[in-house]
Structure formats: structure tokens, C-alpha cells
Amino acid sequence: MAIIYLILLFTAVRGDQICIGYHSNNSTEKVDTILERNVTVTHAEDILEKTHNGKLCKLNGIPPLELRDCSIAGWLLGNPECDILLTVPEWSYIIEKENPRNGLCYPGSFNDYEELKHLISSVTHFEKVKILPRNEWTQHTTTGGSQACADYGGPSFFRNMVWLTKKGSNYPIAKRSYNNTSGEQMLIIWGIHHPNDESEQRALYQNVGTYVSVGTSTLNKRSSPEIATRPKVNGQGGRMEFSWTILDIWDTINFESTGNLIAPEYGFKISKRGSSGIMKTEGKLENCETKCQTPLGAINTTLPFHNIHPLTIGECPKYVKSERLVLATGLRNVPQIESRGLFGAIAGFIEGGWQGMVDGWYGYHHSNDQGSGYAADKESTQKAIDGITNKVNSVIEKMNTQFGAVGKEFSNLERRLENLNKKMEDGFLDVWTYNAELLVLMENERTLDFHDSNVKNLYDKVRMQLRDNAKELGNGCFEFYHKCDDECMNSVKNGTYDYSKYEEESKLNRTEIKGVKLSNMGVYQILAIYATVAGSLSLAIMIAGISIWMCSNGSLQCRICI
């Protein structure tokens, strides 16, 4: 019964209160900062795309060029197995298998092949133009072919090239020119044949000591065949060596040869340039569209970063090696502590956030004779929202120099360069990834500090208004020394609290209670004092009862003196 009286006493003593706090929810989102790991926040935004659809798709409505079982060389030279590629429309990117079967059917090499593929990565359409028609080589045989490039079981040759051999027993000097009047730059490919022995040389070209000369305003190349015995490839001991150049507008290319010339019948006008690329993959085009393509699959996202593949084509996020990039946009999420104790106190911002406040990030909880409730502080919440709205864009702007992995290729003789290039690219990507991760950590630290600062500013705003008309309870709450109805509470919230109006009432109520001061003593200390007093009183009553009983039965003599 005494405890009930004590609780009622404490309840009666408790004054009106206003608390400053912040929003919390059931979110389990976690972010990292410079100083902390796995900080639970109310709101966060994942800015790293980790998924793709596993498909090769049209890019912005334009299909890629599927080389199927052909290589770039097989396509450009016109391998008979690649006839489907003789005429191709505009492409968005090129799909080439890792090891296509149909390349140089007649064995040999392609000079600066990797550089050519790099050039093609910036082209989205070739227009094939006949530059040196085969029927104009009237003094030479133009039907040269090989079983290595068989077509329907018979010997054939690259469709876009002309293998010039002797006519009868003569091979007069072959001289032809082409002037580029197409209005665009043009890719020109030619070759030289290296026979297996001198008898093959005479059988094909009659002449020995031959040469092939090619010249433009910027090129002067003269080559001679290297006659040597070699192991047979595709049944051939000879080799063909192909070269290429870009012929500028109005420039002229001149060919001159006394034998062994593989002449171009067609050139490739670069009719459209764009951000293309060569995807090394075994995949095939599927019925889908995307704005961003990788060799592994298409990415459809609005996020600023991805970790899928360094080689991308289209409007793509920036590539990083990170496994996780989460940007904090909300506050630290500390669920409200529902520990009401003897007073039914509402936890303030020190103890935890409020799930009951749903219309803002920061705000108030008040309790008085008219009731209690939450109210968000619209002004501070809106300022915070404005400050964080463009945070993702800010991160992107700070990382606006994308490191591009262009998928360079190297020949077998350039392995050291390839390894060095790979190490450099890996190093750049490591630095790029570190910068992105560090930027996110710093932004998260700033965001959480920003929210903490806003809560503190709101607290200070209330404290400066109330001054000594209320006492700070140490948990984000103030207890008034005067009665504060709803109108009074609203004036505190909107910053129009009239200190002088309540000053006298507060002075009267600030008189400290002598003995036990509730303002600085905990519940357990109060209960301990109560228990001590109650125990002493019970002991005194017990001793008095025993004494009266002993006096009544004669065990104790009692004398009352007046």
C-alpha cells in the first residue's frame, strides 16, 4: 500500500514535459563510415549494380554484328565460310567468339591486327566499296584460289581479295591506283604471298626477286616475298601476310608489283563512327534491348556504379571492383526504448528514436494535462531533405572521370606488353575502386554527422527558449516548472515561447524539496530510502509489541512513573 502511495506521490510531482527526438523505423539497412562499420540507418540507397540478365541484346534498338564462327579477319577478307557477312548493316557492337574457326583460311598473318580491331571498336558501320575490280587486271590471272579456302569442295579464295598470278608464262608489272572520292576515310587491305619454294614461285608468278609496293601520301611500304620451307598448315607450306591502312579523303593509294600481290577488290568506307566495341563471348543475340551491354549480359539500371565487367558499351554505370557501396540518406536507426519505469517516460534522442513520428526526421513529443503526442519539425526536416536529395548526383560528379577498359588485344609476340597492360589496368581499377569506396565512406560520415547536428540544433533551440523555466532531464527532454498547455507547447515548437509570461510561476516551483531531491536521485535510490525507513518502522513496532506482551504475562516488569 505504501508503494502505491509513493507512486502516486511521484506521479503527482511530475510536471509537463517536451522532448526532442528523431525518427526511427524497422529498417535493417546498414552502412559503413570512415569511423564505423555496419551502422544501422533509417534510410539508405544501394548505388552499386550487381546483376545482369545474362543476355546479349540490341543496344538502343540497334542489333550487334554477330560474327558467328568467323573472326574479324575472316569477315574483312571474305573467308568463304563467312559469306553471310559479305554485306552487313549498321551495328551497335560486335560479337566475336574467343576462338572462331574461320579466320585466315590460307595460313599466314595480319600485320597490326590488334590495332585494326581497336580501330573497329570506334566504328559502327562499314560500306563496302569496289575499288579495284578484278576484271580490270587484264594482263594477269585473277582466279587464283586454294583448297585451304575450299568452297563446295573446290578451291576458292577470300571474297574481297584478288590473288594475281601469271597469265600464260608472263607476269608483267601490275600497277593500279585508287583515289578516295567517297567523302569518308576508307579501310584498305592488301597482302603478299610467301611461297614454300622457288618452284612454287615460278609456277605462280614466273618471276623471282619480286616485290610489292604500296604508297599513299603518308605510307611508303615495299615488301619482298620470303621463300622458305615451312610446315604445312591447312595443306599449305606457303604463307600470306596481310597489311592495312586508312586512306584519307581525296588521297590516292598506288599498288605496284612484279609478283606475289594479293590485291584488294573492295575497300571499306567508314560511313559511321560511334562508341562500339568487340565483345569476346560465346553468347548469341537474344530478343531483348538494353542501354548498357557487357560480355556477361545486359545491365538495366539507374545506379551510378556496377561491378559486373570492366568492358561495357552504351550508357553504363561506372565500373568498380567493390562488392558493396551503400549510401546513407537517413539517420542512425536506434529503435525507441519502451522503458517507461515508474514515470512512463518517453525516451529522448539520447536513448533512441521514435517510430511514432512518421511525418518528419526530427521533432517533438510532449505530455501535459491535455494529453501527449508527436509532432515533426517541418523546417529542419525540409532543410535536411534538401541537403541530401542531390547526394547521389554529387558522388557521381566527384567521380566524373571514368577509367575505360577498352579490351586491348596483343599478339603472341607482345605478351610482356599484355601483362604490363593488364597490371596497369588492374592498378587503375584498384585506385578507382578505392576512390569510390572512400568517397562513400566520407559521405556517409558527413550524412550521419549532419543528422546528429540537426537534432542538437533543435535541442539547443528549445533550451535557449526555456532557459530556467524548465529543467533538462538528460535524455533529450525538458520538464517545465510551470503548467504548459497545448498552446504553450506549440509556441515552444514554433519558436514563439514567451519566457517572461511563465517566469514567476517557474520561480515558485523551482524551490528544491528538502531531503530527497527527485531531480537528481534515481528511482532505485528513492526505493532504497523508503525500504530503510519502512524497515526501521516495522522493527520499532515489533519491539513495542513484544514488550507489551512480556509485561502482560509478567515476564517483564513495567513501571510507569509520573
UniProtKB/Swiss-Prot annotation:
A lipid is attached at C551, C558, C561 (S-palmitoyl cysteine). The record marks R340, G341 as: Cleavage. It comes from the Viruses. Residues 1-15 form the signal peptide. Gene3D superfamilies: 3.90.20.10, 3.90.209.20. Residues 547-562 are cytoplasmic. It is found in: Virion membrane; Host apical cell membrane. GO terms for biological process: clathrin-dependent endocytosis of virus by host cell; fusion of virus membrane with host endosome membrane; fusion of virus membrane with host plasma membrane; viral budding from plasma membrane; virion attachment to host cell. Residues 16-525 are extracellular. Pfam families: Hemagglutinin. Palmitoylated. In natural infection, inactive HA is matured into HA1 and HA2 outside the cell by one or more trypsin-like, arginine-specific endoprotease secreted by the bronchial epithelial cells. One identified protease that may be involved in this process is secreted in lungs by club cells. Glycans are attached at N25, N26, N38, N179, N180, N300, N494, N509. GO terms for molecular function: host cell surface receptor binding. SUPFAM superfamilies: Influenza hemagglutinin (stalk), Viral protein domain. Disulfide bonds join C19-C477, C57-C288, C70-C82, C105-C149, C292-C316, C484-C488. InterPro entries: Capsid_hemagglutn (IPR008980), Hemagglutn_HA1_a/b_dom_sf (IPR013828), Hemagglutn_influenz_A (IPR000149), Hemagglutn_influenz_A/B (IPR001364). Keywords: Clathrin- and caveolin-independent endocytosis of virus by host, Clathrin-mediated endocytosis of virus by host, Disulfide bond, Fusion of virus membrane with host endosomal membrane, Fusion of virus membrane with host membrane, Glycoprotein, Hemagglutinin, Host cell membrane, Host membrane, Host-virus interaction, Lipoprotein, Membrane, Palmitate, Signal, Transmembrane, Transmembrane helix, Viral attachment to host cell, Viral envelope protein, Viral penetration into host cytoplasm, Virion, Virus endocytosis by host, Virus entry into host cell. Major glycoprotein, comprises over 80% of the envelope proteins present in virus particle. Binds to sialic acid-containing receptors on the cell surface, bringing about the attachment of the virus particle to the cell. This attachment induces virion internalization either through clathrin-dependent endocytosis or through clathrin- and caveolin-independent pathway. Plays a major role in the determination of host range restriction and virulence. Class I viral fusion protein. Responsible for penetration of the virus into the cell cytoplasm by mediating the fusion of the membrane of the endocytosed virus particle with the endosomal membrane. Belongs to the influenza viruses hemagglutinin family. This is Hemagglutinin.
